[in-house]
Amino acid sequence: MPKVISLQTSFNSGVLDPRLASRTDLKHFYQGAEEATNVITMPQGGVKRRPGFKYVATINAEARLASFAFNVEQTYLMVFTNLSVAIYKDGVHQADVTTPYTTAQLFELQWTQSADTMILVHEDHAPRKLVRGGSHSSWTLSTITLSNVPQFDFGSGAEDVWSGTRGYPKSATFYQSRLWFGGSLQRPQTIWGSKTNDFFNFDDGTSLDDEGIDVTLDTDQVNAITAVYAGRHLNIFTTGGEFSIQDSPITPAKVAVRRETLFGSTSIPPKMIDGSVIFIDRTGKSVREFLFSYNEDAYTSGTVSLLASHLLNSPVDMDVSKGTSSDDANYLYFVNGDGTMAVFNTLRAQEVSGWTKWETTGEIESVSVVVDEVYVIVKRTIDSSVVRYLEQLDVDSYTDAN
């Protein structure tokens, strides 16, 4: 019999799930791969070897990473560890600041930023602000003084809705000149908006347009809020579904919460990329894009991990690197519970999307992107000792920091 040789000129679909091994009826079959480890798929169709992870610093404890960007030139990497945060600029240590967040709370911590101030929230702690001073090494963390805290009757008369007993906000975002808090220990379905341009004042007064907002989701079951996110609209992610508030502007008299989809999400904060908000659904096995449809005047939550769902293994962290030019793809990095990383590239305008797997001789535990620089925390075994390194993806490095 003659031998049939097929020519494959594109790998845009990346790694394909083993269950698709015989799906010759799919176009992805002809631009995918059975395995693609430690490579990067390019929107033009090719693949290239991923850069190495360059050593930056030794971290002496479990850590979680976050980015802080005042502008494209003044950017910082935050390394949260037990009761402390270390601040780096361009890979150089600048300062250490004491925090109240324990190791067990690090991956429950959420934040949002406005100019030189980062708002930090956790349901066990009063909201705090991390403020950059006049130099790269000048930082201050303090408890936010909130005025006119919303009141609620928990059964013994009206009291502050947030307290050490009742819990504090677990998510936050800035939207339409208000600071929004989402969910707390004993008010898991409620969102609160500050007064307009008065971020720490939640006075609802007489419900004038610029006054505070207090809204509880109207659902048939308790869907605890996992994140509030400023996307095209104010998006609300919960354990049981996804919601939006599309009013413009949102006021106490005009705030309609719309239930959009019913997938639910984990506590990993969502990310905006390529016109959609990416979130991990409550199963921890699917990545979905919360995308507004003009035709339906509603949001959809299609899965973007269907073709390579086997690369996801209980994700614990994620971040996004946005393309810097019109022909460069966007990349999403998902840190798995087993220490590997699933990398998704997307360029919607060119119908490009694909997954690859990254691994190293160690376990990747956290990821953060500072502008276009990718940083990770890696747990490695060096000379029989377990260490944790802060490492940076570096195009000039051909090996990892072993």
Question: Each predicted region: which residue ranges?
Answer:
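N-terminal beta-propeller domains
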Residues: 1-93, 129, 133-233, 240, ...
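Surface-exposed ligand/attachment interfaces on beta-rich extracellular proteins
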Residues: 57-62, 101-105, 160-169, 261-263, ...
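Beta-strand-rich solenoidal segments
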Residues: 84-158, 340-395
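Beta-sheet-dominated scaffold domains
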Residues: 109-111, 178, 216-402
